[in-house]
Amino acid sequence: MDLPGPIHDFLLVFLGSGIILGGLGVVLLTNPIFSAFSLGLVLFCISLFHIPSNSHFVAAAQLLIYVGAINVLIIFAVMFTNGSEYYNDFHVWTVGDGVTSLVCTSIFVSLITTILDTSWYGIIWTTRSNQIIEQDLISNGQQIGIHLSTDFFLPFELVSIILLVALIGAIAMARQ
């Protein structure tokens, strides 16, 4: 990215100060949740350091992996290990819990039935005549996006569903 000198310097100072303040927050804050959020600020600023050097994909990947996954995992681990001092009584199932589990089970069964009944071999995912790909004109980030939305669409979506289920399970465990 060709930024003018003062804007580039301001961006570096802004991101550097975000890293320093976030690092101080990680070390000095006594609440572990606030420390985890400060770590998220540090990881966010570190990922933005790649943008001035035209590494947009690396910045986006670090943002998704470190801030979106690792920091959320750390927050859930902190929430899970601290326990809740407000909610220590035995949880009795209510009607809402039963309805929710019934709805989730029916959605799960319908998804599994749809997956098993679909003839995956008859689906034409892409045709090369529709894809005019000039390798010299498309950047690496665009090639990764094309492959994720064509060749690897089904595995990408399955992984996202598995991660969503894991996230919901972590939330349920952290609440208890």
Curated annotation (Swiss-Prot):
InterPro entries listed in its UniProt record: NAD(P)H-Q_Oxidoreduct_6 (IPR050290), NADH_UbQ/plastoQ_OxRdtase_su6 (IPR001457), Nuo/plastoQ_OxRdtase_6_NuoJ (IPR042106)
Cellular component, GO annotation: chloroplast thylakoid membrane
Subcellular location: Plastid, Chloroplast thylakoid membrane
Catalytic activity annotation: a plastoquinone + NADH + (n+1) H(+)(in) = a plastoquinol + NAD(+) + n H(+)(out); a plastoquinone + NADPH + (n+1) H(+)(in) = a plastoquinol + NADP(+) + n H(+)(out)
Family of the protein in this entry: Belongs to the complex I subunit 6 family.
Top-level taxonomy: Eukaryota, Viridiplantae, Streptophyta, Embryophyta, Tracheophyta
Protein name from the UniProt record: NAD(P)H-quinone oxidoreductase subunit 6, chloroplastic
Record PANTHER family: NAD(P)H-QUINONE OXIDOREDUCTASE SUBUNIT 6, CHLOROPLASTIC
EC number(s) reported in the record: 7.1.1.-
Keywords: Chloroplast, Membrane, NAD, NADP, Plastid, Plastoquinone, Quinone, Thylakoid, Translocase, Transmembrane, Transmembrane helix, Transport
Record-annotated disulphide pairs: none
